[in-house]
């Protein structure tokens, strides 16, 4: 389910910059699938349509749920130049949604930066109050608990939901679907068709 997105990127000469905010024990596959779509968009067009960076709350390296460490480009505060922010969560997301994270996410939202949740990153957005009035989705294992904890949210049992400037997906390969729709809304369906043929 998607509403239109207008970042005016088709007319811009600079790349659309996506910052991935990693939470501890993030799901590596969901993150790498999302980045893979952006990389393929650049490769197929031979242009730098998208750039991306990886940040953590405090700028320190993090270990994924698979036990692999990812190089971090900076802290959440360093992500001011992002056009889009995507929060990547994992199995233990509730442990990591403290005041510093919610305050940081609210600052991002106040700058009118579109923001999304990959896998359980949706939970972090909900805790910060950034999904109030929006449709959203989350990993299927977390659907019931999210509905119970946030009964006012409109939570869909969908692979992904794009509602205005909020983007959420259920994790795993659904981050591919989310990012394909994001790319389609910015750079068109023809490019997405070409990207899809590579996966």
Enumerate the language-model features and the residues they cover.
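A generic structural signal for well-ordered coil/turn residues at beta-strand boundaries
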Residues: 58, 81, 156, 162-163
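A conserved active-site-flanking secondary-structure segment within enzyme catalytic domains
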Residues: 131-162, 194-195, 199
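Extended, subdomain-level signal for the structured scaffold at the beginning of enzyme domains
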Residues: 1-115, 124-127, 180, 184, ...
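Short, amphipathic alpha-helical segments
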Residues: 95, 99-102, 137-140, 144, ...
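Short gly/pro/ser/thr-enriched loop/turn and capping motifs at secondary-structure boundaries
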Residues: 122-124, 143-144
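Residues at the C-termini of beta-strands that transition into short coil/loop
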Residues: 56-58, 74, 140, 159, ...
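Conserved anion/nucleotide-ligand pocket segment
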Residues: 157-197
């Amino acid at each position: 389910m998607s509403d239109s997105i207008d970042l005016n990127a088709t007319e811009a000469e600079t790349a659309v910059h996506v910052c991935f905010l990693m939470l501890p024990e993030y799901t590596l596959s969901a993150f790498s699938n999302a980045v893979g779509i952006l990389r393929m968009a650049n490769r197929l067009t031979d242009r730098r349509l998208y750039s991306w960076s990886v940040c953590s709350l405090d700028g320190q390296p993090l270990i994924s749920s698979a036990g692999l460490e990812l190089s971090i480009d900076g802290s959440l505060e360093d992500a001011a130049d992002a056009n889009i922010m995507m929060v990547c969560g994992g199995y233990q997301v509730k442990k990591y949604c403290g005041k510093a994270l919610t305050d940081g996410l609210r600052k991002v939202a106040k700058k009118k930066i579109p923001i999304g949740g990959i896998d359980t990153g949706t939970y972090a957005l909900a805790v910060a109050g950034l999904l109030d009035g929006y449709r959203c989705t989350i990993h299927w294992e977390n659907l019931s608990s999210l509905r119970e904890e946030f009964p006012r949210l409109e939570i869909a049992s969908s692979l992904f939901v794009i509602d205005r400037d909020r983007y959420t997906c259920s994790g795993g390969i659904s981050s591919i679907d989310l990012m394909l729709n994001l790319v389609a809304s910015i750079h068109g369906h023809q490019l997405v068709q070409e990207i899809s043929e590579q996966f």
